[in-house]
Amino acid sequence: MEISTSILSVKKENAIQTFYNLEVAKTDYFHIDVMDGKFVEQNTMLYMLEYATTIKHISNIPLDVHLMVDKPREQIEDYIDLKPTYITVHYEAFKEEKQLEDTLLYIKQNGCRAGISIKPDTSVEKIYPYLEKISLVLVMTVEPGYGGQKLIETTIPKIKKLKTYIEENKLECFIEADGGINLENIEKLNEAGIDIAVVGSAIINSNNMKETIQKMKH
């Protein structure tokens, strides 16, 4: 299992040192939470792009971009030049199937892996038709918008169901879980079948980032 560290709670005055510490701690990805103040209440658009650009200049750790926005296409254009490994858009942000499919294609045409994210209340069956076209499903294990929330336990059976479907249909699609993940509950998610865990507060606020990340990986 890989760890994608959310930098949502990183303070600007400590940002560069924190990014360096996370690289030394061997995070697998930097998770970039892009919020527009519309799809979710919080707005991180300006400083997240600044953070992502800084990381690209000082680190070789890949970026994992999660767009929690009403108009994903506009934000994708901001991030494409940074060559993130993943750009993930929310299923709920699209009114029409064609809009979603066109957006996924646009991400892939620009050299990134496309992902779809779903909120805790969205059933996994709704994204089954898209699984052949994407590399990642991001299952929100809290309501999107804020860090430091408690994991919603009812999302775990949803992850198991998704994992079974992917394996039965021999699909090449990873599962990522995001929200409320810590040392106490990460093993449940590992057993449910996730490939990548997005972890924020539990790493950023720990006394030893490297030790915390290594414990989470094993």
Each predicted region: which residue ranges?
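Glycine-rich, proline-tolerant flexible connector loops at the mouths of alpha/beta enzymes
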Residues: 30-49, 91-93, 142-148
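Glycine/small-residue-rich loop that forms an oxyanion/phosphate-binding "nest" at active or ligand-binding sites
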Residues: 44-103, 116
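Catalytic cores of alpha/beta
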Residues: 15-20, 71-81, 122-134, 180-197
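Histidine/lysine/aspartate-rich catalytic loop segments that bind and position anionic ligands
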Residues: 117-155
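Glycine-rich phosphate-binding active-site loops on the catalytic face of alpha/beta enzymes
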Residues: 86-95, 138-149, 192-212
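Hydrophobic faces of well-ordered beta-strands that scaffold small-molecule active sites
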Residues: 3-6, 30-32, 63-67, 87-89, ...
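Alpha-helix-loop-beta-strand connector modules within alpha/beta enzyme cores
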Residues: 45-65, 106-115, 155-175, 179, ...
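Conserved, mostly hydrophobic/aromatic
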Residues: 15, 22, 30-33, 79, ...
